[in-house]
């Protein structure tokens, strides 16, 4: 049985899925870049976090479907960083914003 969401809930769900898409792509891209920077250990961590974020997105997508909301396909802007330090700084800032 599909439930209809309020406009407030729709907005919240759209923001949540946009953030999860954002961080999934950001961590995935950092995983690829870290491998190129010869930092296999950190690359593995970025990969694990990207997968976890994709699972979060899946859970939100299930709720979006339940409430019959048309999901956004536009993530919030990503900031990858060019160095490992910049990557970690971007990720830390993003984590603080979403707590």
Features from the language model and the residues they span:
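Acidic/His metal-coordination segments adjacent to aromatic residues that form catalytic metal sites
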Residues: 2-12, 74-94
